Regions:
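Flexible hinge/capping segments at coil-to-helix
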Residues: 107-125
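Short helix-initiation/N-cap motifs at beta->coil->alpha
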Residues: 41-42, 56-67, 114, 148-162, ...
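Extracytoplasmic small-molecule ligand-binding "clamshell" domains
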Residues: 2-80, 88
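Periplasmic-binding protein-like
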Residues: 98-105, 176-219, 236
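A ligand-binding cleft/hinge motif common to bilobed small-molecule-binding domains
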Residues: 63-67, 80-89, 137-140, 161-162, ...
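Ligand-binding clefts/hinges and TM-proximal coupling segments of bilobed small-molecule sensing domains
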Residues: 4, 133-148, 189-190, 218-236
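A structural signal for short loop-to-beta-strand junctions that line the ligand-binding cleft
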Residues: 6, 36-40, 87-99, 187-191, ...
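Alpha-to-beta junction loops
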Residues: 15-16, 51-54, 70-79, 124-125, ...
Length: 236
């Protein structure tokens, strides 16, 4: 039987965590220093500290996020939405935060949309990033619209800001940061958000020893109010 990632981390003294660095405020790469900052980074820094090991953030992107766990490029990932597709290949920790999805556009186009159904029309361009949960969602939700798929590091919202697309869908988490950062971004008015989704860390599917360790740590930190503190710090 292969040894657990837990043994490897403790013997080598390094916890390797895959992160994309493009999900504000969860994980953001500071191009000036090449360091990562954000909610995830604070969580992982604490996990490494509690384990008594060093933290190494390993750059990845959304389309290879799961593959990196499977291949052993890192011991776990930062926050990722739980999805049936990812569950086929990787394990997850317990969830510690949840998101829900909203559509966004720009101030010059916000008058064109009223609710989810108004987006699902011929002539509407919906932008999304390859390999994200959002890509699957928009293809399912808007079969009549034109889906514009871009590859990271490009992002769906950038296509909308540049005028090459009309709408992007993202979580309340990223949406709030984009509304703050870009004055011309507007949330499309909808009756209810869609796809409320728990967020968790991706882990090697068959490594139950490591999964158990991470889950027990999450429960401990939840009880101590740690996740609430970090969420408050990052405005979540």
């Amino acid at each position: 039987m292969a040894q657990s990632a837990l043994n490897e981390i403790l013997s080598e003294g390094v916890l390797k965590v895959g992160t994309t660095g493009d999900w504000n405020p969860m994980s953001v790469r500071d191009t000036a220093t090449n360091e990562y900052v954000g909610y995830d980074i604070d969580i992982m820094t604490q996990l490494a500290a509690d384990m008594g090991v060093e933290l190494e953030m390993v750059p990845t992107d959304w389309k290879t996020l799961v593959n990196g766990v499977v291949a052993g490029n890192y011991h776990m990932t930062g926050s990722a939405s739980i999805s049936p597709a990812r569950l086929k290949a990787a394990g997850y920790s317990h969830s510690y935060i949840a998101v829900e999805m909203f559509p966004f556009t720009t101030d010059d186009k916000v008058g064109n949309f009223d609710g989810w159904d108004s987006i699902n029309k011929e002539g509407v361009k919906v932008a999304t990033t390859l390999g994200t949960s959002f890509e699957k969602m928009v293809k399912e939700w808007f079969p009549e619209a034109e889906i514009v798929v871009v590859e990271a590091p490009a992002r769906g919202f950038q296509e909308v800001l540049s005028g090459r697309a009309d709408v992007f869908v993202t979580s309340n988490i990223e949406g709030s940061t984009l509304l703050e950062k870009f004055p011309n971004v507007r949330q499309v008015e909808v009756d209810t958000p869609r796809a409320p989704t728990p967020i968790a860390m991706l882990l090697p599917q068959t490594d139950q020893v490591w999964i158990n360790y991470v889950n027990s740590w999450i429960e401990l930190k939840k009880t101590q109010g740690f996740f609430e503190e970090v969420a408050l710090k990052w405005g979540l």
